[in-house]
């Protein structure tokens, strides 16, 4: 089950929080969900260059507060906040509601699963070899303090006629352990041969009520880091 389900949704209420944090009666819930979709779609398109990893939406009465978590917040704000004001006015015209936008800098962007997936997708679109792109992102995540990382790409890799799936894993990624803090990201690379899907799982430690458990040190005979990989061909 842990291999199939979204690891963030599986851990909601345990060590992860919702990205839409509001409550409404049943009559207004569908319209609120549609508004959240419009907000995320618009801001993702307008802020693609800033390395956005998450949009957190909160509601109070007829006001909407959006917190944007990005690796390069300065590009979103613009000179004297001009760019952010443009986004507010555009959303106000779309939703006919007052929208407040807060910018928050992403901590350790190299260990952020969504940013890592988008980084790999961008490299694939630039015709970088997929194995090189995967291993480069994995090394950066481990250096940034991740306990483990798993990367999977699916599609017509290297222009092959038959689609296949390949993945690499370094360290531990315990998807069945609910107290494990697992970050998950997904992105798509639009290549000349078709779409290549990229999935990234990053393990950041086990969480208890008192904090994060320290990682147990395991002595290795060889002393080298273990990197596992697997390839699987898809059906035509």
Swiss-Prot record:
The KH type-2 domain covers 39-107
Q: Which GO terms describe its molecular function?
A: mRNA binding; rRNA binding; structural constituent of ribosome
The record, for CDD domains, names: KH-II_30S_S3
Region annotated Disordered sits at 214-236
Statement: the UniProt record of this protein carries the keyword Ribonucleoprotein = yes
Q: Which UniProt keywords apply?
A: Ribonucleoprotein, Ribosomal protein, RNA-binding, rRNA-binding
> Which BP terms from GO are recorded?
translation
Q: What is a single cellular component term in the Gene Ontology annotation?
A: cytosolic small ribosomal subunit
Q: Does the keyword Ribosomal protein apply?
A: yes
* Pfam families, alphabetized: KH_2, Ribosomal_S3_C
Basic and acidic residues bias: start-end ranges = 214-229
Family as reported in the entry's similarity comment: Belongs to the universal ribosomal protein uS3 family.
PANTHER family reported for this sequence: 30S/40S RIBOSOMAL PROTEIN S3, SMALL RIBOSOMAL SUBUNIT PROTEIN US3C
Q: What does this protein do?
A: Binds the lower part of the 30S subunit head. Binds mRNA in the 70S ribosome, positioning it for translation.
* Self-association state and partner proteins as the record states: Part of the 30S ribosomal subunit. Forms a tight complex with proteins S10 and S14.
Supply the name of the protein: Small ribosomal subunit protein uS3
- Gene source species: Helicobacter hepaticus (strain ATCC 51449 / 3B1)
